[in-house]
Amino acid sequence: SHSKRYGIPRRDFIQYMATVSAIPLAAVTAECAVVDNPLFDGNPFTLGVASGDPEPDGVVLWTRLAPNPLQHGGMPNEAVRTRWEVATDEGFTNVVRSGTALAMPQLGHSVHVEVDKLKSHSWYFYRFHVGNETSPIGRTRTAPARDAMPDRVRFAFTSCQHYESGYFNGYPHLQKEDLDLVVHLGDYIYEYGGQENRVRKHIGSEINSLPDYRMRYTQYRLDKSLQETHRMFPWLVTWDDHEFDNNYANLVSEQDGISPEKFLARRMNAYQAYYEFMPLRRRSFPHGPHMTLYRGCQYGQLANFQVLDTRQYRTDQPNGDRTKPLTGKVFDPQGTMLGDRQEHWLMSNLLRSTSTWNVLAQQVMMAPLNRGEGDDRRYSMDQWPGYEVSRRRLLKF
């Protein structure tokens, strides 16, 4: 209808678009509102630094200013100018790239810098400055040249890190590895409210608003093991469902009776917070409740990573979700995990790829794992076996 856009009330949509539209122009139009030398009561880099989406000539650098991280960041409602440096050595005696970037209140004072003109397949060190404060020194690595054949590519993948279920003890082990890249396959956070008698407790109830989602990411990123792994390696990230809501499928909520307006308004909050906290390029900037996260990442002629999004475009889970026999809607030719556009993009990339290995960085199990007992064979309808026609198309490639 004329009163809605993306299923969201027009007034809310216009307010959102006015906010995000102002961001690229901020450096031009808001010079008088930019704070160049802020003073902080505490360390503004409590959430550390990160890098991601490596290319042969560059990488994304990330930080977020939050002197009081659990008090919604503790930043004033104004833009702050940060300075960044990239060097070939940890002492920064050979700085090869530097510049400034605005930390905008509209994006929770997060900073995303796309650095280019770097050498391929090389380690670099980076840091941010704001006022008289300096961030921890991050380490990152560019990808090999597209026509190069490196001897090896070493990467680790992580996923499904539930804060309440335990400490992130895998990360200190990962930090000891000689890695080129960390790939996160989704469920970076969990959206559930805090539970008693768990190892750790989420702050607040189930998250819904933008401040809620920001707080949850903040709580996770304050974990020292996670923060340190971000500091040490570039990351390639994608989401699954819990960055928004359990088992959602495109525009369909797991719960019955959720209006499209509420669903999309919440998805908009979730997607914006995800972008704010991840080292992503501007090409992934969210547009309302939509965000293009699927993308490629090539490591020379050795490996070609295809990063997938199996949530935003899929059809509803068949047979009422959960674990069910492979019958009925499982074989619906219209059933899709990726959506037409993403599947076409993926197949085109695979056809064009000349790399030895094509790696699908994606969220859910491809193999049909029987979760039943005896002759009662049951499979997760939320995973690829629930989308059997789509699965077979991909495996036939």
Q: PLM features: what roles do these ranges have?
A:
Residues 1-25, 32-397:
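Metal-dependent phosphoester/phosphodiester hydrolase catalytic core
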